[in-house]
Amino acid sequence: MSRRVYMEILKILGQRLRELRMERGMKQREMAELLEMTLRNYQRIEGGEINIPTLTLCALADYFAVTTDYLLGRSGRRQ
Protein backbone atom coordinates (compact mmCIF):
# COMPACT_ATOMS: atom_id res chain seq x y z
CA MET A 1 0.00 0.00 0.00
CA SER A 2 1.36 3.40 -0.90
CA ARG A 3 1.87 6.04 1.76
CA ARG A 4 -0.72 8.24 0.04
CA VAL A 5 -3.39 5.52 0.29
CA TYR A 6 -2.44 4.78 3.91
CA MET A 7 -2.77 8.45 4.86
CA GLU A 8 -6.14 8.72 3.07
CA ILE A 9 -7.48 5.75 5.06
CA LEU A 10 -6.37 7.37 8.33
CA LYS A 11 -8.04 10.63 7.28
CA ILE A 12 -11.33 8.88 6.48
CA LEU A 13 -11.19 6.92 9.74
CA GLY A 14 -10.75 10.14 11.69
CA GLN A 15 -13.58 11.89 9.85
CA ARG A 16 -15.98 9.02 10.39
CA LEU A 17 -15.13 8.71 14.08
CA ARG A 18 -15.68 12.44 14.54
CA GLU A 19 -19.03 12.25 12.74
CA LEU A 20 -20.22 9.28 14.81
CA ARG A 21 -19.00 10.83 18.06
CA MET A 22 -20.80 14.08 17.36
CA GLU A 23 -24.02 12.26 16.42
CA ARG A 24 -23.96 10.82 19.94
CA GLY A 25 -23.24 14.20 21.47
CA MET A 26 -19.96 12.99 22.92
CA LYS A 27 -16.83 15.02 23.59
CA GLN A 28 -13.39 13.88 22.54
CA ARG A 29 -12.45 13.47 26.20
CA GLU A 30 -15.32 11.00 26.69
CA MET A 31 -14.14 8.95 23.71
CA ALA A 32 -10.59 8.95 25.02
CA GLU A 33 -11.81 7.69 28.40
CA LEU A 34 -13.96 5.02 26.74
CA LEU A 35 -10.93 3.79 24.79
CA GLU A 36 -8.60 4.17 27.79
CA MET A 37 -6.21 6.49 26.00
CA THR A 38 -5.05 10.05 26.38
CA LEU A 39 -7.11 12.88 24.98
CA ARG A 40 -4.19 13.88 22.76
CA ASN A 41 -3.96 10.41 21.22
CA TYR A 42 -7.68 10.39 20.51
CA GLN A 43 -7.38 13.84 18.93
CA ARG A 44 -4.57 12.53 16.75
CA ILE A 45 -6.76 9.62 15.62
CA GLU A 46 -9.58 11.97 14.63
CA GLY A 47 -7.00 14.16 12.92
CA GLY A 48 -5.84 11.23 10.81
CA GLU A 49 -2.35 11.43 12.28
CA ILE A 50 -2.02 7.98 13.88
CA ASN A 51 -3.32 4.47 13.34
CA ILE A 52 -5.25 2.44 15.90
CA PRO A 53 -4.93 -1.20 16.97
CA THR A 54 -7.22 -3.71 15.28
CA LEU A 55 -9.00 -4.54 18.54
CA THR A 56 -9.73 -0.85 19.12
CA LEU A 57 -11.13 -0.58 15.59
CA CYS A 58 -13.41 -3.56 16.26
CA ALA A 59 -14.53 -2.11 19.60
CA LEU A 60 -15.39 1.21 17.94
CA ALA A 61 -17.35 -0.54 15.20
CA ASP A 62 -19.33 -2.43 17.85
CA TYR A 63 -19.86 0.69 19.96
CA PHE A 64 -21.20 2.73 17.04
CA ALA A 65 -22.99 -0.27 15.43
CA VAL A 66 -21.17 0.15 12.13
CA THR A 67 -18.83 -2.07 10.15
CA THR A 68 -15.07 -1.78 10.21
CA ASP A 69 -15.26 -1.32 6.43
CA TYR A 70 -17.39 1.78 7.01
CA LEU A 71 -14.91 3.20 9.52
CA LEU A 72 -12.03 2.63 7.10
CA GLY A 73 -13.83 4.14 4.12
CA ARG A 74 -14.13 0.84 2.27
CA SER A 75 -17.92 1.12 2.29
CA GLY A 76 -20.39 3.97 2.39
CA ARG A 77 -22.92 1.80 4.20
CA ARG A 78 -22.86 1.77 7.97
CA GLN A 79 -24.23 -1.76 8.20
Identify the role of each PLM range.
Residues 1-8, 62, 72-79:
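Short, charged recognition helix plus adjacent turn
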Residues 2-23:
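A short, Lys/Arg-rich alpha-helix, primarily the initiator
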Residues 15, 25-26, 52-55:
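Residue-level signal for the short linker/turn that defines the boundary of a DNA-recognition helix
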Residues 22, 33, 62:
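Alpha-helical residues within the helix-turn-helix
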Residues 25-44:
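Short alpha-helical DNA-recognition segment
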Residues 49-59, 78:
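Short, basic-rich loop-to-helix N-cap that marks the start of a DNA-contacting helix
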Residues 55-70:
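DNA major-groove recognition helix of helix-turn-helix/homeodomain DNA-binding modules
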